[in-house]
Amino acid sequence: MKRKVLRVIDGETVFPPPIWMMRQAGRYLPEYRETRKKAGSFLDLCYSPDLAVEVTLQPIRRFGFDAAILFSDILVIPHALGRDLRFEEGKGPLMTPIDADEIFWLETEGVAKRLEPVYETVRLLREQLPDETTLLGFCGAPWTVATYMIAGHGTPDQAPARLFAYRFPEAFEKLLNDLADVSAEYLIEQLDAGADAVQIFDSWSGVLDEDCFERFCIRPVARIVQKVRAVYPEARIIGFPKGAGMLYAGYREKTGVDALGLDWSVPFSFAAALQEEGAIQGNLDPLRVVAGGNALDEGVDTILERLGQGPLIFNLGHGITPQAPIENVQRMIDRIRGGKS
């Protein structure tokens, strides 16, 4: 029997909708925090298949989500490209900013093969997950990954990357193309290892104007999709251009993704129009899970009422926060699964 999440990606309406959460294996879970301590560094956790499997399975055991998403990080790609990368408490990811000249020296040949521990994690997960649970792989979109490579860290509006793109257009285009090519190989390897579907995270797409969104977000993601589909024509792909606003319109058609992840700022009338084209995923404000109570219940109910009649994967509009109480996550799940169509 086809897994629920895959049925929705294929355009079927399933009610109650399947549910998973971005960052569902994360710091809000005490068992995650314990495993994280054992690993040493965050990257060690990402590159240790047994530990990465454990933290991926933790939210499945606790909550019975309909999908498990591979535990890793979008920045393993630049790390595999030879960029230094470290994660510091309270600061997030840090790396030495790349300059325009260095981009022309980047070599992409065989880079995806350096991420074998990630593929081993996928293989082990497919063996250990319940049959009904969808296994999702993922990568970061080239624009979002490039913003960290250029600034060396996250910034409020990723101004360093935008300025770099304006000043060094040729270097920036090469960087996006290189990242797209390696990311496509990376996703193909995940599908080889047993992933049922993959998601492309473009967390910083919302800081771009319309022209740059087309060049920096849509074209590189379309390049990834085309390369993946050359190997896996039936590959199921979710695109998540967070903060895209009105530019969500046309994203699915232009990139070729099957399902569209929405953030919580998307009006329901617009979301419903996007849903007429195919599956959508989202889009509860993560802070409603932190708040709990009526704020959570009303958020869940509204999504079910406005979007539950079409192909919907229930998710948050971004990753769950470390402050989210576990009991509120369970309350959300119970309310979704007890929902009325």
Swiss-Prot record:
GO BP, one annotated term: protoporphyrinogen IX biosynthetic process from glutamate
Cross-referenced Pfam families: URO-D (PF01208)
Binding site for substrate: R23, Q24, A25, G26, R27, D73, Y148, S203, H318
Keywords from the named record: Cytoplasm, Decarboxylase, Lyase, Porphyrin biosynthesis
Subunit description: Homodimer.
Function (record text): Catalyzes the decarboxylation of four acetate groups of uroporphyrinogen-III to yield coproporphyrinogen-III.
PANTHER family reported for this sequence: METHYLTETRAHYDROFOLATE:HOMOCYSTEINE METHYLTRANSFERASE RELATED, UROPORPHYRINOGEN DECARBOXYLASE
The protein, known as: Uroporphyrinogen decarboxylase
Gene symbol of the encoding locus: hemE
